[in-house]
């Protein structure tokens, strides 16, 4: 069996082996949610202004970082938008040095790492992100408008498949990595200033979120192992271990 996070995966996998489960996310992300304005204040941002969150993973994404640097004039001119920029720990010193050598950009806030992603997500009006399955599952459950820039450095280009699965449903905007330098920030600024577009993206991605993914997958594993669970409770199961890369495949 092949557990997938969204519909339309029969284009890439045998249809008779697919089961729609979603991807499990850490419970803390969807528990004790706070309002956008409260989250913005916790981050030291102005709730009255739009917020764009740029995340390239804990290590960072070179192309996203370079796109920020090449778009400084456009970012600087967008005074009513705040840009929270997670550079990744490998890039923070370089990016800060290059920013210091440039004209001041008061609405750009670089950081190497965001400890409280639940707060960062809550504060953001638009997210710019790679297209990993885990991140997409988080964004779907939270209903966040997102521009997905798939990493080209992954097995079988699976992030592009992830992004396409959402883009075809108008649940995300897909920009290839090769086009980010010219297209990313003009698109981001246009989208975050378009209330109807933001709303549509939020509503469509929220429909794709599956809240009980862990339970669905655990049931499938146990059924294949000859231990089907016929009740709604999995409290008698002590441990289920998953080992996977990119997606969950049960053979």
Regions found by a protein language model. Name each.
Residues 1-40:
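Active-site-proximal region of nucleotide-activated glycan assembly enzymes
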Residues 34-127, 160-163, 168, 175-185:
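Donor-nucleotide binding loops and adjacent catalytic segments primarily
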Residues 41, 197-211:
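A short, well-ordered alpha-helix in the C-terminal region of glycosyltransferases
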Residues 117-159:
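A donor-sugar binding/catalytic signature common to diverse glycosyltransferases
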Residues 173-179, 191-195:
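Conserved acidic donor-binding segment of nucleotide-sugar-dependent glycosyltransferases
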Residues 211-230:
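C-terminal alpha-helical cap of glycosyltransferases
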Residues 230-251:
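ATP-dependent carboxylate-amine ligase
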């Amino acid at each position: 069996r092949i557990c997938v996070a969204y519909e339309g995966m029969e284009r890439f996998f045998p249809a008779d082996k697919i089961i729609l489960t979603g991807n499990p996310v850490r419970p803390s992300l969807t528990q004790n949610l706070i309002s956008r304005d409260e989250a913005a204040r916790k981050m030291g941002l102005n709730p009255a202004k739009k917020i764009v969150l740029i995340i390239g993973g804990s290590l960072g994404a070179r192309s996203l970082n370079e796109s920020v640097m090449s778009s400084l004039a456009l970012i600087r001119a967008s005074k009513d938008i705040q840009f929270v920029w997670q550079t990744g720990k490998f890039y923070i010193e370089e990016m800060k040095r290059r920013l210091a050598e440039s004209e001041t950009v008061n609405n750009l806030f670089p950081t190497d790492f965001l400890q409280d992603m639940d707060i960062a997500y809550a504060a953001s009006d638009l997210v710019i992100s790679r297209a990993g399955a885990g991140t997409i599952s988080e964004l779907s459950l939270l209903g966040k408008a997102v521009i997905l820039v798939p990493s080209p450095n992954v097995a079988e280009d699976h992030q592009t498949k992830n992004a396409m699965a959402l883009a075809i449903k108008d649940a995300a905007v897909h920009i290839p990595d090769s086009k980010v330098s010219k297209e990313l920030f003009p698109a981001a600024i246009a989208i975050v200033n378009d209330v109807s577009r933001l709303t549509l993206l939020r509503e469509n991605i929220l429909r794709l979120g599956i809240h009980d993914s862990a339970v669905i997958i655990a049931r499938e594993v146990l059924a294949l192992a000859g231990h089907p669970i016929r009740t709604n409770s999995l409290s008698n199961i002590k441990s289920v271990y998953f080992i996977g890369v990119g997606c969950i495949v049960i053979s």
